[in-house]
């Protein structure tokens, strides 16, 4: 059990008034502000699911079990850093419009000088408020509003890892996006987080500044951006035979190639997220047949094939529920292949409460440039219509499994199905 998190000394170290608001930065950097305001960085504290998870699950859990308080306070080290550094814990709810609502603001990133942990984890940033702001670029002119100092640390993935790696009180890596990057091909090639999430483009950095051809845009687009998710994985499906008779067996093979992410997919809040492969055949008369994935036989595979299972029983602790049986684990059609890594509580039940995670299950996510191959063995029904049979493979993605979202009354957009990709093939059914 890890009872001390890396940055406990940050708690209450500063005051709200030590930091500028993002709106003040907007007066000189309007474009950058608008980019940031559309990204999850600006909503890390105010986003509806984060608010529900924190105030309905995390805070009540820490009241039931005081051991959890340090970790639950620590959520704010990355979701509401100004509140954490101001010692206002838990912070006021978003509706109260406190400085906690600044979320991950301009100041939070541009006052960071280095990491205090290796690997970086749990808000391990060294930060000092003041007139000096740090940039990855050597300034050509100085701002009248503040001093600019170049700092290469802002260009590293370790900078991002301060918050995109997380270890819970039990020593479990419950978020490891930067570590996944480091272990993969993008890390070995030096293709940083910034290349995908802060791409370079021609842009005017400040109203009184020059236009650069290679400015880092502050888009921060990720899992909540359907346009970013779309196309992450390439799909191809093919049959083993093209002509088949009713009653005959056809094997469809699907290749899923991660051609877009430098980390695993899904990543981040992995306890919440699923991607799943759904294969459906439609015969010449429009009859539809759902195909179930072939089992491979690896340990923990049962968590990667959708079915009728209850999970997330530990929500009963913060919600103070008696005889709570849990909710459906997956909430999708049975027999689909799921790309996920399950998180388990002390009782061995799956959990979406990362602070309560005691162990991790099989990691069946898709790594960077990895190709997963899945097979679907389909015995054609005798009543299948002769003619062309179309077969569609689609990879879907959900930020939060729908049964949990419905149970906690999370706004529907958090469990909306995002289509990652699809591919079609066909066979001919003989009379």
Annotate each PLM feature.
Residues 18-22:
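An acidic-aromatic substrate-binding cleft motif
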Residues 387-391:
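Exposed beta-strand face motif in extracellular beta-rich ectodomains
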Residues 1-16, 32-67, 87-358, 362-368, ...:
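Primarily the internal scaffold of c-type cytochrome electron-transfer domains
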């Amino acid at each position: 059990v890890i009872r001390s998190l890396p940055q406990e000394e940050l708690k209450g170290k500063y005051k709200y008034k030590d930091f500028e608001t993002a709106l003040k930065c907007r007066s000189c950097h309007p474009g950058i502000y608008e980019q940031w305001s559309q990204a999850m960085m600006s909503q890390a504290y105010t986003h509806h699911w984060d608010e529900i998870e924190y105030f309905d699950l995390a805070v009540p859990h820490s009241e039931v079990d005081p051991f959890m308080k340090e970790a639950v306070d620590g959520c704010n080290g990355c979701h509401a850093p100004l509140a954490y550094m101001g010692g206002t814990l838990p912070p006021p709810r978003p509706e109260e419009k406190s400085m906690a609502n600044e979320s991950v603001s301009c100041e939070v990133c541009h006052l960071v000088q280095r990491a205090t942990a290796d690997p970086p984890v749990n808000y391990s940033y060294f930060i000092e408020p003041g007139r000096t702001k740090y940039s990855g670029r050597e300034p050509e002119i100085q701002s009248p509003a503040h001093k600019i100092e170049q700092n290469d640390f802002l260009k590293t993935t370790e900078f991002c890892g301060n918050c995109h790696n997380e270890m819970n009180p039990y020593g479990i890596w419950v978020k490891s996006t930067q570590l996944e990057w480091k272990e993969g091909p993008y890390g070995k090639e030096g293709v940083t987080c910034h290349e995908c999430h802060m791409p370079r483009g021609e842009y005017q950095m400040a109203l009184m500044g020059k236009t650069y051809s290679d400015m880092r845009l502050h888009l921060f687009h990720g899992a909540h951006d359907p346009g970013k998710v779309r196309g992450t994985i390439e799909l191809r499906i093919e049959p083993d035979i093209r002509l088949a008779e009713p009653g005959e067996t056809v094997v469809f093979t699907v290749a899923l190639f991660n051609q877009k992410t430098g980390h695993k997919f899904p990543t981040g809040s992995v306890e919440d997220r699923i991607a799943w492969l759904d294969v459906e055949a439609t015969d010449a008369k429009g009859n539809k047949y759902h195909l179930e994935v072939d089992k491979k036989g690896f340990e923990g595979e049962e968590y990667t094939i959708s079915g009728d299972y209850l999970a997330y029983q530990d929500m009963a602790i913060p919600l103070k529920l008696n005889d709570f049986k849990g909710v459906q684990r997956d909430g999708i059609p049975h027999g689909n292949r799921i790309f996920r890594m399950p998180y388990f509580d002390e009782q061995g039940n799956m959990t979406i409460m990362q602070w309560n995670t005691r162990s991790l299950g099989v990691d069946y996510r898709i790594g960077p440039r990895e190709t997963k191959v899945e097979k679907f063995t389909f015995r054609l029904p005798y009543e299948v219509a002769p003619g062309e049979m179309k077969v569609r493979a689609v990879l879907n993605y959900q930020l939060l499994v729908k049964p949990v979202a419905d149970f906690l009354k999370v706004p529907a957009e958090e469990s909306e199905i995002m289509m990652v990709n699809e591919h079609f093939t066909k066979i001919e059914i003989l009379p």
